[in-house]
């Protein structure tokens, strides 16, 4: 695999490569010249918008989420899962930004079209903010990045103090897909939010796997206090699927969480696949589910 040689101005960001992985075969300078940027996910666009970056020339095609108004005139480069390499190449970007969950699929493709790429850690809120710090250095937005990071640290510390004396509830998280579902672990974004809120995932970090295929018979043995349900896409369709599954599959009647009406459906815009800036609202919503008795 070809190793990138970045010029000296970028060497200061190498300590953050755990958060932003770098690839490609072009060098990029960190001067005052506005870089041409392609962002292949909505979450990445939102980060750039928060950093007040203007040079975005390519954005993902999406029917479910809104692209920041700042980038409404940027070229569509196709779906986040499979961006169009020919369109990206035609835009002559200095940098392409994508989530690191897709690095295995996209890294070699970016190399093949000769563009430099950066992969952001969007698997947790903490990872997102470390990536923001790295991008601040790369894009000359260090002040904005530091401000955002400090705001997150202040919120996180204040939030952690609210329930540190309370018993942590155990939680089962189901991530729905049309026609099926998987278990989300602490390694997933929604799982990281539950952990940040003080919940204990009954499947832990899944040995580093974001999602696990588990049958309900095994889940019931974990005896979760709470069941949370969210979706990867098509939220209304998935919500109906979950309702039918829980109504027709007798195994769910044996869960104390079901018996105690502690099953909650989450908004997939806040509790989706990638970290985003709705984490404050998400944590406050989780707070009501984790620490107060409730009903569906």
Predicted features by range, described:
Residues 1-7:
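Bacterial N-terminal signal peptides that target proteins for export
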Residues 15-18:
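C-terminal motif of bacterial Sec signal peptides marking the signal peptidase cleavage site
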Residues 20-23:
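Bacterial signal peptide processing site
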Residues 35-51, 144-197:
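Basic- and aromatic-lined ligand-binding clefts that recognize polyanionic substrates
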Residues 35-36, 129-132, 137-138, 146, ...:
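Structured C-terminal subdomain patch of bacterial secreted/periplasmic proteins
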Residues 36-91, 95-101, 202:
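A short, structured surface patch at a secondary-structure boundary
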Residues 61-67, 182-211:
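Alpha-helical, coiled-coil/dimerization segments enriched in small aliphatic residues
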Residues 85-98, 115, 215-229:
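Proline-aspartate-enriched helix->loop->beta-strand connector
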């Amino acid at each position: 695999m070809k190793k990138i040689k970045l010029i000296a101005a970028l060497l200061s960001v190498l300590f953050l490569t755990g958060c932003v992985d770098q690839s490609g075969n072009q060098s990029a300078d960190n001067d005052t010249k506005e870089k041409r940027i392609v962002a292949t996910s909505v979450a990445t666009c939102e980060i750039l918008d928060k950093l007040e970056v203007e040079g975005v020339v390519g954005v993902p095609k999406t029917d479910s989420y809104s692209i920041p108004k700042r980038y409404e005139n940027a070229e569509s480069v196709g779906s986040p899962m499979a961006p169009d390499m020919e369109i990206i190449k035609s835009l002559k970007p200095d940098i392409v930004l994508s989530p690191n969950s897709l690095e295995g699929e996209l890294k070699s493709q970016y190399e093949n079209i000769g563009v430099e790429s950066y992969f952001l850690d969007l698997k947790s809120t903490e990872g997102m903010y470390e990536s923001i710090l790295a991008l601040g250095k790369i894009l000359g937005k260090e002040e904005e990045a530091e401000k955002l990071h400090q705001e997150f640290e202040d919120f996180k510390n204040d939030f952690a103090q609210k329930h540190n004396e309370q018993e942590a509830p155990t939680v089962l998280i189901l991530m729905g897909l049309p026609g099926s579902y998987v278990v989300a672990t602490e390694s997933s974004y929604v799982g990281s939010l539950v952990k940040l809120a003080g919940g204990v995932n009954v499947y832990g970090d899944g040995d580093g796997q974001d999602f696990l295929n588990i049958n309900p018979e095994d889940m019931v043995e974990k005896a979760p206090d709470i069941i949370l349900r969210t979706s990867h896409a098509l939220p209304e369709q998935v919500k109906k699927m979950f309702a039918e599954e829980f109504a027709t599959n007798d195994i769910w009647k044996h869960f104390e969480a079901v018996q105690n009406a502690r099953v909650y459906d989450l908004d997939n815009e806040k509790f989706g696949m990638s970290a985003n800036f709705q984490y404050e609202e998400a944590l406050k919503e989780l707070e009501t589910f984790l620490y107060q008795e409730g009903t569906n």
